[in-house]
Amino acid sequence: MVTLLTRRGMWFMRRWVGAALLLGLAGHCAAADGPACGRPLTLALHEHGLLYSATTDTGIDKDFADELVKRSGCRVTVSVMARARIWELIESGALDFSLSGITSEARDKFAGFAWYFSNKYYLLVRNDAKVRELASFEANTKLQLGVIRSFRYGPKTNQFVDRLTAENRITYAAGLEPLYQILALDRIQGMIIEPFDYSQVAGRAIRDITTIIDTGDGAVPHGLIMSKRSLTATEQAKWQALVQSMRADGTVLRIFEKYFSPELARAMTVF
């Protein structure tokens, strides 16, 4: 009887040890497939409408960053800085990540991307400018446009901004708030906005003196920005996989539904 119990005990022990080894191996493989967390990483947010507000420490990109960091298992230091500074640090490799970035030929040389939403750009223009399309704004040489420094848009809007830049008809700012102020003062007559900015327009007096005009561009993909100087192509692919998992399981859609109607949230995140 004692011998029988011992044999059974040894059998169960072998099964238990085998299962533990398999679980350990699976955990090791999962860790190997995830991003490398051997050093502290850095991510910068920028203030921009519903994407992020430093005043309340809330926004779409804050929610996205929290979930991304949690899934990665890495230690990531999150800061807030101007968009122009973010691009400089991404290019130099002094910053690993930022969010809601769009690509360009120049940026593709130093940054990788993992797309998680797509949206259109619009021209917010003063009613007294009597403008109904980009062409009529451009044709009136007295009209000035305000843009956030280092921002790029869709192809048609980029060409529009570049032509006005050549004519010295651009006023730059670090963020939206200064542009709203000088638009109200008629120092500029138009500015480029996104759906993230609608709530700010609707909640202030500027709504009564402006009109939103379609730029004619299609939706532009936005995503996680990754520095090619600080992250290898292999590591970028791992972060891209994390972002894709957040899209696939509906996490990105649920984040956007906190800030937009279900219809608009789906239009921006399912593409």
Residue ranges and their predicted role:
Residues 75, 152-171, 243-271:
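Ligand-binding clefts/hinges and TM-proximal coupling segments of bilobed small-molecule sensing domains
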Residues 79, 84-96, 138, 176-197, ...:
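Short helices/loops that flank or line small-molecule/ion binding pockets
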Residues 33-102, 106-109, 172, 239, ...:
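Extracytoplasmic small-molecule ligand-binding "clamshell" domains
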Residues 41-45, 113-134, 225-227:
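Hydrophobic/proline-rich hinge and linker segments of small-molecule sensing/allosteric domains
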Residues 45-48, 119-122, 204-243, 262-271:
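Periplasmic-binding protein-like
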Residues 65-72, 115-116, 141, 151-173, ...:
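Ligand-binding cleft/hinge of the Venus flytrap
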Residues 85, 100-109, 189-218:
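A ligand-binding cleft/hinge motif common to bilobed small-molecule-binding domains
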Residues 125-145, 160-161:
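Flexible hinge/capping segments at coil-to-helix
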